[in-house]
Amino acid sequence: MAVPTVTMQSLLDVGAHFGHQTHRWNPKMKPYIFGDRNGIHIMDLSQTVPLFTRALDFISQTVAHGGKVLFVGTKRQAQEPIADAARRSGQFFVNHRWLGGMLTNWRTISGSIKRLKSLEEKLSGDTAGFTKKEILQLTRERDKLELSLGGIRDMGTIPDIMFVVDANKEELAIKEANTLGIPVVAILDSNVSPDGIAFPIPANDDAARAVRYYCDAIAEAATRGDQQNRQELGEDLGAAVEPAAEEALA
Protein backbone atom coordinates (compact mmCIF):
# COMPACT_ATOMS: atom_id res chain seq x y z
CA MET A 1 0.00 0.00 0.00
CA ALA A 2 1.36 3.40 -0.98
CA VAL A 3 1.86 5.85 1.88
CA PRO A 4 2.22 9.66 1.74
CA THR A 5 5.56 10.65 0.25
CA VAL A 6 7.92 12.38 2.67
CA THR A 7 10.87 14.14 1.05
CA MET A 8 13.90 15.99 2.34
CA GLN A 9 12.73 19.12 0.49
CA SER A 10 9.23 19.07 1.98
CA LEU A 11 10.72 18.77 5.47
CA LEU A 12 13.16 21.62 4.80
CA ASP A 13 10.31 23.79 3.49
CA VAL A 14 8.45 23.59 6.81
CA GLY A 15 11.57 24.00 8.96
CA ALA A 16 11.57 20.45 10.30
CA HIS A 17 15.37 20.47 10.52
CA PHE A 18 15.64 23.17 13.21
CA GLY A 19 16.12 21.77 16.70
CA HIS A 20 16.45 23.71 19.95
CA GLN A 21 19.38 25.72 21.29
CA THR A 22 22.35 23.43 21.82
CA HIS A 23 22.40 23.96 25.60
CA ARG A 24 18.82 22.62 25.84
CA TRP A 25 19.50 19.33 24.10
CA ASN A 26 18.93 15.82 25.41
CA PRO A 27 22.13 13.78 24.82
CA LYS A 28 19.99 10.74 23.96
CA MET A 29 19.06 12.52 20.72
CA LYS A 30 22.70 12.72 19.60
CA PRO A 31 22.30 9.93 16.97
CA TYR A 32 19.60 11.99 15.23
CA ILE A 33 21.44 15.32 15.17
CA PHE A 34 23.37 16.39 12.07
CA GLY A 35 25.23 19.27 13.70
CA ASP A 36 24.60 22.81 14.88
CA ARG A 37 24.35 26.25 13.35
CA ASN A 38 24.49 29.51 15.31
CA GLY A 39 23.84 27.68 18.55
CA ILE A 40 20.88 25.71 17.19
CA HIS A 41 20.94 21.96 16.65
CA ILE A 42 20.13 20.76 13.15
CA MET A 43 18.22 17.49 12.86
CA ASP A 44 19.54 14.80 10.51
CA LEU A 45 16.75 14.71 7.93
CA SER A 46 18.47 11.87 6.06
CA GLN A 47 17.26 9.77 9.00
CA THR A 48 13.94 11.55 9.41
CA VAL A 49 12.73 10.67 5.89
CA PRO A 50 13.00 6.86 6.20
CA LEU A 51 11.86 6.87 9.85
CA PHE A 52 8.80 8.96 9.01
CA THR A 53 8.01 6.74 6.02
CA ARG A 54 8.31 3.65 8.23
CA ALA A 55 5.90 5.16 10.76
CA LEU A 56 3.39 6.08 8.06
CA ASP A 57 3.50 2.56 6.66
CA PHE A 58 2.89 1.11 10.13
CA ILE A 59 -0.10 3.41 10.65
CA SER A 60 -1.60 2.56 7.26
CA GLN A 61 -1.19 -1.17 7.82
CA THR A 62 -2.64 -1.00 11.33
CA VAL A 63 -5.72 0.98 10.26
CA ALA A 64 -6.15 -1.32 7.25
CA HIS A 65 -6.60 -4.14 9.77
CA GLY A 66 -9.21 -2.18 11.73
CA GLY A 67 -6.86 -0.43 14.16
CA LYS A 68 -7.45 2.97 15.76
CA VAL A 69 -5.05 5.91 16.00
CA LEU A 70 -5.08 8.39 18.89
CA PHE A 71 -3.58 11.79 17.99
CA VAL A 72 -2.15 13.60 21.04
CA GLY A 73 -0.98 17.21 21.01
CA THR A 74 -1.96 19.66 23.74
CA LYS A 75 0.53 22.49 23.08
CA ARG A 76 -1.01 25.58 21.52
CA GLN A 77 0.37 25.18 18.01
CA ALA A 78 -0.64 21.50 17.87
CA GLN A 79 -4.21 21.73 19.14
CA GLU A 80 -5.95 22.68 15.90
CA PRO A 81 -3.86 20.53 13.49
CA ILE A 82 -4.24 17.51 15.79
CA ALA A 83 -8.04 17.83 15.93
CA ASP A 84 -8.39 18.59 12.21
CA ALA A 85 -6.23 15.64 11.16
CA ALA A 86 -7.97 13.17 13.48
CA ARG A 87 -11.46 14.23 12.40
CA ARG A 88 -10.54 14.18 8.72
CA SER A 89 -9.18 10.64 8.93
CA GLY A 90 -11.95 9.27 11.15
CA GLN A 91 -9.58 8.81 14.09
CA PHE A 92 -9.44 10.19 17.65
CA PHE A 93 -7.62 12.93 19.52
CA VAL A 94 -6.70 14.61 22.78
CA ASN A 95 -5.72 18.26 22.27
CA HIS A 96 -6.63 20.02 25.51
CA ARG A 97 -5.24 18.30 28.60
CA TRP A 98 -4.22 14.71 29.18
CA LEU A 99 -6.19 13.38 32.14
CA GLY A 100 -4.28 10.92 34.31
CA GLY A 101 -5.60 7.43 33.64
CA MET A 102 -7.12 8.39 30.31
CA LEU A 103 -5.99 5.01 28.97
CA THR A 104 -4.86 3.03 32.00
CA ASN A 105 -8.16 3.73 33.79
CA TRP A 106 -10.36 3.42 30.73
CA ARG A 107 -13.38 2.18 32.70
CA THR A 108 -13.60 5.45 34.64
CA ILE A 109 -13.03 7.50 31.49
CA SER A 110 -15.81 5.53 29.77
CA GLY A 111 -18.12 6.54 32.61
CA SER A 112 -17.26 10.19 32.04
CA ILE A 113 -17.94 9.80 28.31
CA LYS A 114 -21.36 8.31 29.11
CA ARG A 115 -22.01 11.30 31.35
CA LEU A 116 -21.05 13.66 28.50
CA LYS A 117 -23.48 11.95 26.12
CA SER A 118 -26.21 12.00 28.77
CA LEU A 119 -25.74 15.73 29.30
CA GLU A 120 -25.89 16.38 25.57
CA GLU A 121 -29.13 14.42 25.37
CA LYS A 122 -30.65 16.35 28.26
CA LEU A 123 -29.64 19.75 26.93
CA SER A 124 -30.76 19.03 23.36
CA GLY A 125 -34.20 17.88 24.53
CA ASP A 126 -36.95 19.55 26.52
CA THR A 127 -35.33 21.61 29.28
CA ALA A 128 -38.61 22.99 30.61
CA GLY A 129 -38.16 21.01 33.83
CA PHE A 130 -34.86 22.72 34.67
CA THR A 131 -34.25 26.14 36.17
CA LYS A 132 -31.93 28.58 34.38
CA LYS A 133 -29.30 27.93 37.04
CA GLU A 134 -29.53 24.16 36.53
CA ILE A 135 -29.24 24.54 32.77
CA LEU A 136 -26.18 26.74 33.22
CA GLN A 137 -24.55 24.18 35.54
CA LEU A 138 -25.30 21.30 33.16
CA THR A 139 -23.98 23.31 30.20
CA ARG A 140 -20.74 24.10 32.01
CA GLU A 141 -20.28 20.46 32.97
CA ARG A 142 -20.94 19.36 29.40
CA ASP A 143 -18.51 21.91 27.96
CA LYS A 144 -15.78 20.86 30.39
CA LEU A 145 -16.21 17.18 29.52
CA GLU A 146 -16.37 17.96 25.80
CA LEU A 147 -13.09 19.86 25.98
CA SER A 148 -11.30 16.93 27.63
CA LEU A 149 -13.09 13.92 26.13
CA GLY A 150 -14.80 15.10 22.95
CA GLY A 151 -12.04 13.75 20.75
CA ILE A 152 -12.29 10.21 22.17
CA ARG A 153 -16.04 10.02 22.83
CA ASP A 154 -16.57 7.44 20.09
CA MET A 155 -13.27 5.56 20.42
CA GLY A 156 -14.95 2.74 22.35
CA THR A 157 -11.75 1.20 23.67
CA ILE A 158 -8.04 1.94 23.95
CA PRO A 159 -6.29 2.76 20.64
CA ASP A 160 -3.87 0.59 18.69
CA ILE A 161 -1.39 3.41 18.00
CA MET A 162 -0.64 6.74 19.64
CA PHE A 163 0.76 9.64 17.60
CA VAL A 164 2.37 12.38 19.70
CA VAL A 165 3.63 15.88 18.99
CA ASP A 166 6.14 16.92 21.70
CA ALA A 167 7.21 13.90 23.74
CA ASN A 168 8.20 16.11 26.69
CA LYS A 169 4.80 17.73 27.08
CA GLU A 170 2.95 14.45 26.52
CA GLU A 171 5.16 12.40 28.85
CA LEU A 172 2.20 11.09 30.86
CA ALA A 173 0.33 9.97 27.73
CA ILE A 174 3.43 8.12 26.52
CA LYS A 175 3.88 6.41 29.89
CA GLU A 176 0.29 5.17 29.79
CA ALA A 177 0.74 3.90 26.24
CA ASN A 178 3.95 2.10 27.25
CA THR A 179 2.19 0.52 30.24
CA LEU A 180 -0.51 -0.88 27.95
CA GLY A 181 1.86 -1.90 25.15
CA ILE A 182 0.46 0.65 22.69
CA PRO A 183 3.12 1.59 20.08
CA VAL A 184 3.96 5.30 20.11
CA VAL A 185 4.80 7.30 16.99
CA ALA A 186 6.32 10.62 18.08
CA ILE A 187 7.91 13.76 16.70
CA LEU A 188 11.20 14.05 18.60
CA ASP A 189 12.89 17.43 18.85
CA SER A 190 16.49 17.78 20.03
CA ASN A 191 15.44 18.36 23.65
CA VAL A 192 13.48 15.12 24.26
CA SER A 193 14.25 11.52 25.14
CA PRO A 194 13.51 8.81 22.56
CA ASP A 195 12.92 6.28 25.35
CA GLY A 196 9.58 4.51 25.06
CA ILE A 197 9.04 5.62 21.46
CA ALA A 198 8.54 2.72 19.05
CA PHE A 199 8.56 4.93 15.95
CA PRO A 200 10.77 8.01 16.46
CA ILE A 201 10.54 10.86 13.95
CA PRO A 202 13.40 13.31 14.67
CA ALA A 203 12.14 16.77 13.72
CA ASN A 204 11.14 20.23 14.95
CA ASP A 205 8.04 19.97 17.16
CA ASP A 206 7.40 23.70 17.59
CA ALA A 207 7.02 25.33 14.14
CA ALA A 208 3.31 25.58 13.29
CA ARG A 209 3.81 24.71 9.60
CA ALA A 210 5.89 21.68 10.50
CA VAL A 211 3.36 20.42 13.05
CA ARG A 212 0.54 20.70 10.50
CA TYR A 213 2.66 18.88 7.92
CA TYR A 214 3.23 15.93 10.28
CA CYS A 215 -0.44 15.75 11.27
CA ASP A 216 -1.58 15.88 7.65
CA ALA A 217 0.80 13.07 6.68
CA ILE A 218 -0.36 10.87 9.57
CA ALA A 219 -4.00 11.59 8.68
CA GLU A 220 -3.41 10.67 5.04
CA ALA A 221 -1.73 7.40 6.03
CA ALA A 222 -4.67 6.54 8.31
CA THR A 223 -7.16 7.45 5.59
CA ARG A 224 -5.45 5.19 3.06
CA GLY A 225 -5.46 2.36 5.58
CA ASP A 226 -9.16 2.91 6.25
CA GLN A 227 -9.92 2.88 2.53
CA GLN A 228 -8.13 -0.44 2.16
CA ASN A 229 -10.01 -1.84 5.16
CA ARG A 230 -13.36 -0.81 3.67
CA GLN A 231 -12.40 -2.19 0.28
CA GLU A 232 -11.43 -5.56 1.73
CA LEU A 233 -14.61 -5.74 3.80
CA GLY A 234 -16.60 -5.07 0.64
CA GLU A 235 -14.79 -7.82 -1.27
CA ASP A 236 -15.29 -10.27 1.59
CA LEU A 237 -19.02 -9.64 1.51
CA GLY A 238 -19.13 -10.88 -2.08
CA ALA A 239 -21.43 -10.17 -4.98
CA ALA A 240 -24.47 -9.63 -2.76
CA VAL A 241 -23.03 -6.28 -1.66
CA GLU A 242 -21.24 -5.33 -4.84
CA PRO A 243 -22.53 -1.71 -4.73
CA ALA A 244 -21.00 -1.28 -1.25
CA ALA A 245 -17.67 -2.56 -2.53
CA GLU A 246 -17.79 -0.16 -5.44
CA GLU A 247 -18.56 2.69 -3.06
CA ALA A 248 -15.54 1.76 -0.93
CA LEU A 249 -13.33 1.85 -3.99
CA ALA A 250 -14.56 5.29 -5.03
Swiss-Prot record:
Gene3D superfamilies: Glucose-6-phosphate isomerase like protein, domain 1, Helix hairpin bin. Keywords: Ribonucleoprotein, Ribosomal protein. Belongs to the universal ribosomal protein uS2 family. PANTHER family: 30S RIBOSOMAL PROTEIN S2 PROKARYOTIC AND ORGANELLAR (PTHR12534), SMALL RIBOSOMAL SUBUNIT PROTEIN US2M (PTHR12534:SF0). It comes from Zymomonas mobilis subsp. mobilis (strain ATCC 31821 / ZM4 / CP4). Residues 239-250 have a biased composition (Low complexity). One of its GO terms (biological process) is translation. One of its GO terms (cellular component) is cytosolic small ribosomal subunit. This is Small ribosomal subunit protein uS2. Signal peptide: none annotated. Residues 226-250 are annotated as: Disordered. PROSITE patterns: RIBOSOMAL_S2_2 (PS00963). SUPFAM superfamilies: Ribosomal protein S2 (SSF52313). GO terms for molecular function: structural constituent of ribosome.
